[in-house]
Amino acid sequence: MASNIGYDVAGGQFDAMIPGGGVGIFNGCANILGYMRGAQFGGLLSDCENEKGNSGNDEEIYTKRKQCLSKSCNSQFADKYQAKLGCLFLANFLEAAGNPMHTYKEVKCPSVLKDRY
């Protein structure tokens, strides 16, 4: 299990280790099971932002980035089904958002996670 907040994100943001995303300033998960691919900051999403654009609220740019990320997820994790699902979660459910703002609250770590690690 890893916890990562490098204090290089804004208030209301935190780092979540998702296959296809980056590992942030403290890259403790960089080599775990080969799930972290792409740039240290932003992972495959950063690669797509650099390729397709990363500015403005242009719906076309967002669509191109999501398509790029989905394609990268499917190719980079073709043989790692669970990692591919995590990466596609970043692309589809999280709308390929790099550092989105969230409303969240701290909760006690569930025993199912503590028992696993």
Where are these regions (language model features)?
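Mature exported/compartmentalized surface modules and terminal targeting/interaction regions
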Residues: 1-117
